[in-house]
Amino acid sequence: SFQCELVFAK
């Protein structure tokens, strides 16, 4: 995916 997914990790 991208950066946001790594940070939020829903």
UniProtKB/Swiss-Prot annotation:
The record's induction entry says: By water stress.
Give the similarity note: Belongs to the RuBisCO activase family.
Q: What is this protein called?
A: Ribulose bisphosphate carboxylase/oxygenase activase, chloroplastic
Q: What compartments host this protein? A: Plastid, Chloroplast stroma
Q: Does the keyword RNA-binding apply?
A: no
Which organism is this protein's natural source? Answer: Pinus pinaster (Maritime pine)
Report the principal subcellular site.
plastid
Q: What is the lineage of its organism?
A: Eukaryota, Viridiplantae, Streptophyta, Embryophyta, Tracheophyta
Asked if the keyword Chloroplast belongs to this entry, the reply reads: yes
Q: Sorted alphabetically, which keywords does the UniProt record give? A: ATP-binding, Chloroplast, Nucleotide-binding, Plastid, Stress response
